[in-house]
Amino acid sequence: HFAKKGIDSGGDGLICVNNRAGGHLGSHSMEDMYKELNDLGLPLICAGGIGSEIELYKALKIGFDGVQMGTRFVASTECNTLEDYKTAIVNASEEDIVSTTRLTGVPVSVIKSEGFRKDNTWLFKKLLESRFKHKARMILNLSSLFRSKYYLKKNNGKNSKKIQSLYSAGKSVHTIHKIESATSIMQHLGQSINISNIYN
């Protein structure tokens, strides 16, 4: 449905967000997404769960034209975010990545932390299942935004335990072992992948 909407809107390609992505995640595996979308005639970019050359190779071997990597580059020296966020990614395991609807009303992948709550209150659960779901999502989005701004201001721009659950990350965290420069990350990926082996 959404892929066809993208095509009808004149998109040059499709970002295929799978069920291992950070942030707003999809509901299908990368394999299933490719099978479902590969006959649409547009380049397909795999997004979700790509943190090292192993997952990159797998995505290209399946048939994707490229990949989109988010979590890996959050844990880079150039990324302008909290150092605690980067460290949380490096220290996290795949089992630490959980999905919550509390932030925006739709499933979001975050790093589980102290005080984390996965589900919304019963009231928002009901609203998200009703004809008011779009308004409920807007309220949750605004609430998350103002809450994070409040705690950052309260702590003079520093992180606090109150906003740790806002650390979005995908299941590729288990492949990330240190904070590196974007150049180093790209060089390693490029040197590790033998393109000729993928397409032969």
Model-derived features: where do they sit?
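Glycine/Thr-rich beta-alpha phosphate-binding loop at enzyme active sites
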Residues: 1-36, 76, 80-82
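Conserved active-site-proximal phosphate/metal-binding subdomains
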Residues: 29-43, 51-200
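Short beta->alpha connector loops at strand-helix junctions that form conserved
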Residues: 17-18, 48, 71
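Residues that cap or flank secondary-structure elements
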Residues: 25, 47-48
